[in-house]
Amino acid sequence: SHQSMFETFFLQTIFNSPVFILKKELLMIPIFVWYLKKIGSIYINRNKVSKENINFFEDISKIIANTDRPIIIFPQGTRVLPHEQPPFKKGASRIYEELKIKCQPVAINSGYVWPKKGKKDINKTITISILEPIKPDYSKEEFLGILEKTIYSELKLLN
């Protein structure tokens, strides 16, 4: 789940140098773009089919084959408020199906401490749940349903 900027920084510390999949629009944010490039993020242009998008799966496949770096994608496609539950975007399921890799769902309630909009509340605690991996045995439709149910069910417990 993606509720705040917290995940972008903290997940670097608990996973082994992950590769973030991000929307191209984030490359327009000064200073943040430097950080995203420094950690080896890969972007995708969600608005159109392009040559760079065609090479996207090839780039991810190379990373998986040549390193042990996990891939992180926020399936909502954007930050959401803590009680929002928008349907997940199909991009995560396309990566899952194309690469035939397991998925490690993570639920984080950081939106209460570092919200998308508004003041930070340092008196609250952020909880991170690393959930059971989803094996690469499902269709992309089944996977997306399982992923969404798994993460949103856990967030209800955390909130």
Locate the predicted segments by residue.
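Non-catalytic C-terminal accessory region of glycerolipid acyltransferases
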Residues: 13, 54-159
